[in-house]
């Protein structure tokens, strides 16, 4: 059996695969749909398993900075193939003992693996998700896809920067060069117009 993800329905610039599933939100079991967040940016990130080692560092990092994402009209959703019962038990475990503690983001349960499969991150032989991260715009089109192998976590700073960059482009019509951060120079798309940037840099 292949170890690689297959049957992905997730493509840049195309509508993000829709889903509806249970999640743990503020300590309760709640039905969550992607369509609930139309009109907002969505950062959807998958992680392999509850009660592991790299995963809590990522989930806690995103949760602790949820207000920064909220301030730019963005929601963050975490997802794995574990059940909501497993999620809740992990959330209820103190951070100093490897738990998540109080969460400021929904934690989704993809128990039938359909969401992970649709997004192309399912490790079929183990039934767990690779570390996929997807940025979805307010029209629910996919703008960014990153998939890490299991051992390496992701950067909240870089995710926040990417959302800010997509929002800047949509608002101003200019494009963002490598390493762009809010307040730094952008490029006017066009052969002549772009020279303004290149002359300065």
UniProtKB/Swiss-Prot annotation:
Phylogenetic classification of the source organism: Eukaryota, Metazoa, Ecdysozoa, Nematoda, Chromadorea
UniProt xrefs under Gene3D superfamilies: Glutaredoxin (3.40.30.10)
Induction remarks: Up-regulated in response to the drug metformin.
Keyword Chaperone: no
GO biological process: cell redox homeostasis; cellular response to hydrogen peroxide; determination of adult lifespan; heat acclimation; hydrogen peroxide catabolic process; negative regulation of transcription by RNA polymerase II; positive regulation of brood size; regulation of response to oxidative stress
Tissue spec: Expressed in the gonad, neurons and intestine (at protein level). Expressed in the pharyngeal inter-neuron I4 and the sensory interneuron I2. Expressed in the intestine, pharyngeal muscle 1, vulval muscle, body wall muscle, epithelial cells e1 and e3, and neurons in the head and tail.
Further facts: The active site is a conserved redox-active cysteine residue, the peroxidatic cysteine (C(P)), which makes the nucleophilic attack on the peroxide substrate. The peroxide oxidizes the C(P)-SH to cysteine sulfenic acid (C(P)-SOH), which then reacts with another cysteine residue, the resolving cysteine (C(R)), to form a disulfide bridge. The disulfide is subsequently reduced by an appropriate electron donor to complete the catalytic cycle. In this typical 2-Cys peroxiredoxin, C(R) is provided by the other dimeric subunit to form an intersubunit disulfide.
GO cellular component term of the entry, any: cytosol
Reaction(s) this enzyme catalyzes, per UniProt: a hydroperoxide + [thioredoxin]-dithiol = an alcohol + [thioredoxin]-disulfide + H2O
Disrupted gene: phenotype observed: Reduced size, egg production and brood size. Survival in response to heat and oxidative stress induced by peroxides is comparable to wild-type. RNAi-mediated knockdown increases lifespan in response to the heavy metal arsenite. RNAi-mediated knockdown increases expression of gcs-1 and further increases gcs-1 expression in response to the heavy metal arsenite. RNAi-mediated knockdown increases the expression of isoform a of skn-1 in intestinal nuclei.
Activity control mechanisms: Activated following oxidation of the conserved redox-active cysteine residue, which subsequently allows for the oxidation and activation of substrates.
Top-level EC class as recorded in UniProt: oxidoreductase
Domain Thioredoxin, chain residue ranges per copy: 10-168
Main location group: cytoplasm
Keyword vocabulary terms for this entry: Antioxidant, Cytoplasm, Disulfide bond, Oxidoreductase, Peroxidase, Redox-active center
PROSITE patterns: THIOREDOXIN_2
UniProt protein name: Peroxiredoxin prdx-2
Residues at the active site: 55
Signal peptide: none
Family of the protein in this entry: Belongs to the peroxiredoxin family. AhpC/Prx1 subfamily.
Function comment: Thiol-specific peroxidase that catalyzes the reduction of hydrogen peroxide and organic hydroperoxides to water and alcohols, respectively. In I2 pharyngeal neurons, required for the inhibition of feeding in response to light and hydrogen peroxide. In the intestine, plays a role in protecting cells against oxidative stress by detoxifying peroxides such as hydrogen peroxide. In addition, plays a role in the recovery from oxidative stress induced by hydrogen peroxide. In its hyperoxidized form (induced by hydrogen peroxide), confers protection against heat stress.
């Amino acid at each position: 059996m292949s170890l690689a993800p297959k049957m992905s329905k997730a493509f840049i610039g195309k509508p993000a695969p829709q889903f509806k599933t249970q999640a743990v939100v503020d300590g309760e079991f709640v039905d969550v749909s992607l369509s609930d967040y139309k009109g907002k940016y969505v950062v959807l990130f998958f992680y392999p398993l509850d009660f592991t080692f790299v995963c809590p560092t990522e989930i806690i990092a995103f949760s602790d900075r949820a207000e920064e994402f909220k301030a730019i009209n963005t929601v963050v959703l975490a997802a794995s193939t574990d059940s909501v019962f497993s999620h809740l038990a992990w959330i209820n475990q103190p951070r100093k003992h490897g738990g998540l503690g109080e969460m400021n983001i929904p934690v989704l349960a993809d128990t039938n693996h359909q969401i992970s499969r649709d997004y192309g991150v399912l490790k079929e032989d183990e039934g767990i998700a690779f570390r996929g991260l997807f940025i979805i715009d307010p029209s629910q089109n996919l703008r960014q896809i990153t998939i890490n192998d299991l051992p390496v976590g992701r950067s909240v700073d870089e995710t926040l920067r990417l959302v800010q960059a997509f929002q800047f482009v949509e608002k101003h019509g200019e494009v963002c060069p490598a390493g762009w951060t809010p307040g730094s120079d952008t490029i006017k798309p066009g052969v002549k117009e772009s020279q303004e940037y290149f002359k300065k840099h």
